[in-house]
């Protein structure tokens, strides 16, 4: 029945995947969904979903641009922040090193929400929104809220992958390039498409971000990879 068909197709897990070359921005692989003949909504480029902790490198990049160092210290403790006429108390999964002063590098490596909230309070949600847009994210409805530092916004897979190229290439973001050139049947080049490169953060801040993000893989939440 039509109802059975709806239930069947609603049971599928949908996802998107993008692989980019950080040198030129060439898109090497792009998967919009399971099967275009049945699912024509592009989960990689059209769909925007909450990004969670993948937003944190942008917060730390803002901190590095503002003069912070990966080895600056922050209090690892739960704090209640006054946001307008409301209170916001972020939670954290781990109690490791609770009450200690820890480095920002440790905070990102452990994806610690308390350190992110502390940084957000030292900086500005408005500045973070501005930097996210500088990194190529086109969602203009991102709210400059404290909870943004924990991923309370929606970004597409394509936007996020392209944005991360700014960390890999010394602060120079590559826009996605799907076509390098167009030729006719005789091999004559009709059009070429040069890489679109945009400056997003300073070279110094980018190097600091490489140091910070390396910690995620060396001894943080990504160490199992």
Model-predicted segments: where are they?
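A penicillin-recognizing enzyme superfamily signal
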Residues: 1-21, 30, 36-41, 55, ...
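Short active-site loop at a secondary-structure junction
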Residues: 9-15, 38-58, 71-76, 102
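Structural recognition of the beta-strand scaffold that forms the well-ordered cores
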Residues: 16-20, 28-30, 72-73, 106, ...
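Secondary-structure transition/capping motifs at alpha-helix termini
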Residues: 22, 37-38, 64-72, 138-140, ...
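Solvent-exposed loop/turn segments at secondary-structure junctions
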Residues: 23-24, 34-38, 50, 79-82, ...
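Active-site SXXK
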Residues: 24-25, 48-76, 107, 163-167, ...
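Conserved catalytic neighborhood of penicillin-recognizing serine enzymes
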Residues: 68-128, 173, 185-210, 214-215
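Mid-domain, small-residue-enriched loop/turn segments at the edges of structured enzyme/sensor domains
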Residues: 88-92, 123-162, 171, 175-178
């Amino acid at each position: 029945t039509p109802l059975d068909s709806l239930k069947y197709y609603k049971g599928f897990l949908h996802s998107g995947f993008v692989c980019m070359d950080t040198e030129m921005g060439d898109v090497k692989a792009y998967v919009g969904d399971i099967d275009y003949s049945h699912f024509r909504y592009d989960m990689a480029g059209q769909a925007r979903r909450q990004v969670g902790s993948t937003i944190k490198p942008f917060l730390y990049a803002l901190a590095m641009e503002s003069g912070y160092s990966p080895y600056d210290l922050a209090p690892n403790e739960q704090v209640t922040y006054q946001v307008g006429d409301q209170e916001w108390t972020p939670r954290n999964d781990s109690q490791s090193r609770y009450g200690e002063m820890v480095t920002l590098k440790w905070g990102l490596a452990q994806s610690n929400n308390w350190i992110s909230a502390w940084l957000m309070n030292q900086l500005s949600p408005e500045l973070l929104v501005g930097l996210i847009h500088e990194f190529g994210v086109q969602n203009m409805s991102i709210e400059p809220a404290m909870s943004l530092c924990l991923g309370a916004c929606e970004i597409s897979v394509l936007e996020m992958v392209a944005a991360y190229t700014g960390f890999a290439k010394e602060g120079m973001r590559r826009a996605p390039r799907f076509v390098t050139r167009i030729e006719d049947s005789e091999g004559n080049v009709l059009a070429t498409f040069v890489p679109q490169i945009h400056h997003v953060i300073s070279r110094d801040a980018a190097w600091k971000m490489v140091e910070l993000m390396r910690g995620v893989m060396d001894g943080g939440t990504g160490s199992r990879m």
